[in-house]
Regions:
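Hydrophobic faces of well-ordered beta-strands that scaffold small-molecule active sites
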Residues: 15-23, 67-70, 136-140, 197-199, ...
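N-terminal basic, low-complexity leaders that serve as flexible interaction/assembly modules and, when applicable
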Residues: 1-82, 86-87, 222, 300
Length: 303
């Protein structure tokens, strides 16, 4: 099979730019909304091999995309570590209390067993004929972002609590455990068919400049090196990070994702690796010609 993302980010061949959406499977598709209505428990939906595979493939049945993104969630890792995780309407993720002692005693086999349906889903998607000459993107949350959810027990929105760093033993213990089990989760995704891994650091923008190395750069660098050792491309999305140039030079992903609040001209000047994303999603509410014009302008900017 051809490998459009690998060719782009590793071999630096750009004759065919790979195209996919960051939130590819989801509410904009009526076929997804139909499944979601019948399956209100989001965690159970992620653990349903057949339904999650169907959702993963839905966008590719409509659009000629270069890749499928496995239908899952970054919070499946805390779930695998026996933290209660649920998604509440008009609230978002809600996580239960966490005990470091309990966390330290979790065995690799327990974790893999809890997340086995995800790996089976990857295998099922990969074997589908639609995936011929398509990539399959697996993903994880960065250690910092998962730490924020696990301690904060909900979405931090735009800030973390003043006492977040009070218990350094808890923070360091969770980070160490997360690195260990994120590698397990990544390896199982790769072994079952993921061609690319993306690391989402959704709350990187909440880290003070003085703490970036300890909480954003180093933990993610360890994962990046692990993924590269498997000869698999890795894309990082440090949303809101204060210095994309410093991040890309320290963490060394194969490609980097940006959001629409970032100045693309600055990114083009400073970043020397492939860039994904950055187009304002509000453009999709415009007419067809405007969407086409904006997309082409954005592509031409990075030529």
């Amino acid at each position: 099979m051809t490998n459009p993302i690998y060719d782009c980010v590793i071999n630096k061949k750009t004759t065919q730019k790979p195209i996919w959406f960051m939130r590819q499977a989801g509410r904009y598709l009526p076929e997804f909304r139909k499944i979601r209505k019948l399956n209100p428990n989001f965690i159970n939906l992620c653990l349903n091999k057949n339904l999650s595979a169907e959702i993963t493939l839905q966008p590719l049945k409509r659009f000629d995309l270069s890749a499928a993104i496995i239908f899952s969630d970054i919070l499946m890792v805390p779930y695998g570590l026996h933290q209660n995780v649920s998604f509440k309407k008009n609230f978002g993720p809600a996580l239960g209390d966490i005990s470091l002692d309990n966390l330290l005693n979790i065995k690799k086999e327990e974790f893999i067993t809890k997340l086995k349906p995800i790996y089976n889903c990857i295998k099922k998607v990969k074997s589908n004929k639609i995936m011929k000459n398509k990539n399959l993107i697996g993903f994880v949350g960065a250690p910092w972002t998962l730490l924020v959810y696990m301690i904060n027990k909900k979405s931090p929105k735009n800030k973390i609590s003043n006492n977040f760093f009070d218990n350094k033993n808890l923070i360091n213990g969770i980070l160490n455990k997360l690195e260990e089990f994120l590698k397990i989760h990544i390896e199982n995704q790769i072994n079952n068919g993921a061609d690319v891994i993306q690391i989402f650091d959704s709350w990187a923008g909440l880290i003070d400049k003085k703490d970036l190395a300890n909480y954003a750069y180093l933990p993610t660098l360890n994962l990046v090196n692990f993924i590269k050792s498997k000869n698999v491309p890795v894309i990082c999305f440090p949303r809101g990070i204060k210095n994309y140039k410093e991040y890309s030079e320290f963490v060394k992903p194969d490609a980097i994702s940006i959001d629409y609040k970032v100045d693309p001209h600055k990114i083009k000047k400073e970043i020397k690796i492939p860039v994904q994303g950055g187009l304002n999603p509000n453009i999709l509410l415009s007419d067809k010609e405007t969407i086409k014009k904006e997309a082409l302008n954005y592509l031409n900017l990075f030529k």
